[in-house]
């Protein structure tokens, strides 16, 4: 696996969404009573087997900060790329704060029968159109922004533990993000329903450079520091 610095990030998504395996390493920050602190790390990992993809994230606080805020979250999304579209089959998430499991569920998507089945026993109807999850939406969004550079709004049918809903992503404009004393030109995209803000690299096919997420009373930021493909 060839190591590439942020300056030379290679192509992740083509216009046909030909997904390529990669690992993105991020620093994890949280707003605390002592200010915005680097408290841990996160990794995004895209694995490919032909047209089948497995996309995972792992975020956790370092041992030094566990007394202040002990947090971990892992997600997994699987599916395939068909005719330039991301088609989901499965999604899971485990989120812990201290010793308490806040989220732990799986969702199996049966596209040809238009429903999704949760590990809680609930069954959700899928409306016409493609379905993504809170993780694979990153893949779908990057591809759509490549193919529709002048579009300012993207809407997706997203499934999670609460069911299937439509989420709207708004392109707010360009914004420079400083990483290692270098300004990276990005496009800022927000999703009000998820309390999510993305900064996607203009030069590197809208690879997430910064991901800002509000979880309850805590705000987290993931900042890209290294990319491997």
Where on the chain are the PLM-derived regions?
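Flexible, glycine-rich surface segments
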Residues: 122-127, 131-162, 171
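Sec-dependent N-terminal signal peptides
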Residues: 4-14
